[in-house]
Amino acid sequence: MTNGNGTPPEAAPAPQLNVLAQYTKDLSFENPNAPSSLQQQGQPPQINIQINVGANNLSEQEFEVTLSVEGKAETAGKVMFSFELAYAGVFRIVNVPKENLHPLVMIECPRLLFPFAREIIATAVRDGGFPPLMLDPVDFVGLYRQNMERQMAAGGQAGQA
C-alpha cells in the first residue's frame, strides 16, 4: 500500500504505557481483638473485600492511578482483622487515541498494580498473626463496566480520564 506518491505510508507511532513510579499511599492493619483473635477458631472467618480504582491527571500524558483495597475478617460477629490499602502508580501513556485512554487508565493500570497490592496485604495479614490473605484475581474490565453503569445511572459523565 502506498500513500499516493509511490512511497509506503509512515506507520503511526506505537502506543506506549510506562510505569514511572509505584508506592504505598496509605496502609492500615488492625487486629482489635488480639490476642484472643489469634487463637484457633472453630470456623473460617467471613472475609469481605472491596476494591476501587481512582485516577488523577498529572499532565496530558501522565496519570496517577490509585488502587484502594479494604477488607475485614469476622468470626461470630467479632472482627479478627481489618485492613485498608491505597497503592498507587504514576503512568505515562502516549500515542493512545483519546477514546481508548479512559479504559486503559482504569483497567490496565490497576491490573499492573494489583500483584504488588496483593503482596502488601498478604504480608500485613501474616505479620498481624494470621495466615497470609491471598486475594483472588480481580476482573478490572468488569469493575470498570460496573462503575461506568453506576455513573450513567447517576447521570454522571463517563469516559473522563
From Swiss-Prot:
GO terms for molecular function: unfolded protein binding. Pfam families: SecB. One of its GO terms (biological process) is protein tetramerization. It comes from the Bacteria. It is found in: Cytoplasm. Keywords: Chaperone, Cytoplasm, Protein transport, Translocation, Transport. One of its GO terms (cellular component) is cytoplasm. Its main location: cytoplasm. Belongs to the SecB family. HAMAP family: SecB. One of the proteins required for the normal export of preproteins out of the cell cytoplasm. It is a molecular chaperone that binds to a subset of precursor proteins, maintaining them in a translocation-competent state. It also specifically binds to its receptor SecA. This is Protein-export protein SecB.
